[in-house]
Amino acid sequence: MDTSQKTVAVVIPVYKSVNQLANTVSELINTIESSTEFKDLNYKLNKVILVDDGSTDGSNEVISELILNPVITSITLNRNYGQHAAIFAGVLSTNEDVIITMDEDGEHDPLIIPEMIRKIEKDQFEIIYAKFKYKKTDLKELSSVYAKKFIGSISRDPNIKYISSFRAVKGTIFRSAAVYANNGSFLDVALGWISRKVSTVETTKRITQRRSTYSLRGLVNHFSKLFFAAGIKPLIFLFNLGWVVSLGSLIAILIIIYRKVFSSIPVQGWVSNIIVIVFFGGIMISSIGLVARYLSSIVETSSGKPFFTIKNQK
């Protein structure tokens, strides 16, 4: 083998995907092994790591069959820790030059992997995300896009809007992020601690028959974690919002005083009371909730709560 040849590891978190996993892995390996662009870049698929994140549908049995292929290895977590914890568990078992992460349900097209590798190798980027094209009627995906844009704007991190679970990252960058990450960390925010050299490759998310394992509550928790992982900037945003709301309440009160003194429009006394209560009550509740969420993250980290624990590794 060419000693200068670089290696790639693909980490796939697995959760309740008994019907999709085998096809996804087979397509991945066949696509990469038949790619002339991949070979021209002098890269080799060295390892596919399947991380079972507490599946209860028989996915572990499929994994047991797949690991008969020497390229495929597996990690089984003790319970369901979440996608990011599963990915970090896989990343920490790698030593490859580039690490790819993708979903197990077949929505991610492996055909763009050589292009992702090319951007790292030739264009000197360190983090590459798949940029999905969505239909304007896809409310779930569009809400995800706008949520990331909103969080990116208040955290002043322009790269947050690019994040997706289909990514290619230089191995040294990903492993460094995995070492520093903890329960309060959001994977892509952690990557941003290490590198800002981010780019994208455009693709289309494929339609599969699998139902999403994310409930509405799970999606809210997912973006809540991203929001709080953005550091102290949301606190600064809330502080500025408090000033804006206070100014708005002051203007509303001045309007009421003007109408009371200079016009014949009757103003009920309870109107001003409600304005004050709503504005300042809302600010206090938001502030208390925000601070409480930060404190809970600090407590979880300081108490030594594990990010993940491994049951076995093959």
Protein language model annotation of sequence segments:
Residues D2-Q5, N19, V189-K314:
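Hydrophobic helical membrane-anchoring modules
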Residues E37-G54, T76:
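Short beta-strand/loop segment that forms part of the nucleotide-sugar
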Residues D52-N60, G106-E107:
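A conserved acidic beta->alpha catalytic loop
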Residues I99:
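Short aromatic/hydrophobic "clamp" motif used to bind/position activated sugar donors
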Residues S17-F38:
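Short, well-formed alpha-helical segments that are part of the catalytic scaffolds
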